Amino acid sequence: MTNYAIILAAGKGTRMTSDLPKVLHKVSGLTMLEHVFRSVKAISPEKAVTVIGHKSEMVRAVLADQSAFVHQTEQLGTGHAVMMAETQLEGLEGHTLVIAGDTPLITGESLKSLIDFHVNHKNVATILTATAQDPFGYGRIVRNKDGEVIKIVEQKDANEYEQQLKEINTGTYVFDNKRLFEALKCITTNNAQGEYYLTDVVAIFRANKEKVGAYILRDFNESLGVNDRVALATAETVMRQRITQKHMVNGVTFQNPETVYIESDVTIAPDVLIEGNVTLKGRTHIGSGTVLTNGTYIVDSEIGDNCVVTNSMIESSVLAAGVTVGPYAHLRPGTTLDREVHIGNFVEVKGSHIGEKTKAGHLTYIGNAQVGSSVNVGAGTITVNYDGQNKYETVIGDHAFIGSNSTLIAPLEIGDHALTAAGSTISKTVPIDSIAIGRSRQVTKEGYAKRLAHHPSRSK
């Protein structure tokens, strides 16, 4: 059995009120077009053809070499859009799935079931339908007394009886490929919209006594077509629920799943605990046994097993097992933390590698640095890595002790087991096993404070 797919992605999406093509609006981190294309892969199409139009280069860039593309210059209806794919698919034996690029909730399982139903029932066309509590705006499925599909009627063309029908057309179909393009040559624009309706091929097949079937979705949510921001928010809500439920089934605990945002490509191992208001985006992985507390935000990062991240932001970073971060820490892109590193409150790390069991507990900035293992970085330490034109590296050896409020002016190297005194400004190499003091000596003037205006003795 050879399958093909046509994805309709040419529309502008006027009701979105956006310069961005409709199918490129995102749901849970992926464009709607990407969601649809991932689901289409479930039927293993020999060839996928995407119909593009408005801002076609932007749309083409999303799928790149995963699909063939045809251009619809004028948007003259769904039938016209499918006609554009004729140059790619005409004359081929097999079954063709037609699906809109703005239906991000459709699942691969449903599309595979649709194809199987189509093949098993030897249909020339099979419509994916759903039962709607409020069918207004949808095309209605009209059946005869034997339950056979006889036509699909659009909302504007439906009579009073047809408008009461609850079974609706989702806009997804499977056709015998050859018969599809033969039938498209027979449709006209004689309807309320003045467009080529793809649905008109059903009547053509029926007139030729060819078999047309309908496969009813179990979950109405899958039928959602996104035409405005309200529907986009609905799709986001449904997708978020799906994602959190999937992770819960796989052994992840959510304390307040309604407040958590997890994008589609995030992976989470079992026995992770996620508190409320956590955001996980991009290609992030969370290792087993890790705890993410309230307010944590992680994007494109790998978090190892048994880590604890407390109300902190992590971007494009890698954390080994047993790392603790936060509260209120910020790990910026290019950060790597080895096993059991501790990054404490109000610590910022950027473009740095920090060795195992090193601790930076408070109020510290570490940028463009290579920090060894078992280093203690005192509160208020700053790596001065930028001179206004270039960035420079700081290297700190194993078991070094960086005193509180140290200012480390790069380029700089501090050797193993070296120590910098609290309050020092260090700008030269500190050898192994050395102590560096870079501050003025304390001068104490006894009794001098009595001469100052604020002293209590001055107010008498």
Curated annotation (Swiss-Prot):
A Pfam family recorded for this sequence: Hexapep
Reactions catalysed, as given in the entry: alpha-D-glucosamine 1-phosphate + acetyl-CoA = N-acetyl-alpha-D-glucosamine 1-phosphate + CoA + H(+); N-acetyl-alpha-D-glucosamine 1-phosphate + UTP + H(+) = UDP-N-acetyl-alpha-D-glucosamine + diphosphate
Keyword Metal-binding in annotation: yes
Subcellular location: Cytoplasm
Residues holding UDP-N-acetyl-alpha-D-glucosamine: 8-11, 22, 72, 77-78, 139, 154, 169, 227, 332, 350, 365, 376
A GO CC term assigned to this protein in UniProt: membrane
Residues annotated to bind Mg(2+): D102, N227
CDD domains, per database record: GT2_GlmU_N_bac (cd02540), LbH_GlmU_C (cd03353)
Keyword Magnesium: yes
UniProt region (Pyrophosphorylase), positions on chain: 1-229
Pathway per the UniProt entry: Nucleotide-sugar biosynthesis; UDP-N-acetyl-alpha-D-glucosamine biosynthesis; N-acetyl-alpha-D-glucosamine 1-phosphate from alpha-D-glucosamine 6-phosphate (route II): step 2/2; Nucleotide-sugar biosynthesis; UDP-N-acetyl-alpha-D-glucosamine biosynthesis; UDP-N-acetyl-alpha-D-glucosamine from N-acetyl-alpha-D-glucosamine 1-phosphate: step 1/1; Bacterial outer membrane biogenesis; LPS lipid A biosynthesis
Stretch list, region N-acetyltransferase: 251-460
Region annotation Linker: where it falls in the sequence: 230-250
Annotated residues for binding of acetyl-CoA: A379, N385, Y386, S404, A422, R439
The enzyme's E.C. designation: 2.7.7.23, 2.3.1.157
GO BP: cell morphogenesis; cell wall organization; lipid A biosynthetic process; peptidoglycan biosynthetic process; regulation of cell shape; UDP-N-acetylglucosamine biosynthetic process
PANTHER family, sorted: BIFUNCTIONAL PROTEIN GLMU (PTHR43584:SF3), NUCLEOTIDYL TRANSFERASE (PTHR43584)
Name of the protein this chain belongs to: Bifunctional protein GlmU
Organism name: Streptococcus pyogenes serotype M6 (strain ATCC BAA-946 / MGAS10394)
Source taxonomy: Bacteria, Bacillati, Bacillota, Bacilli, Lactobacillales
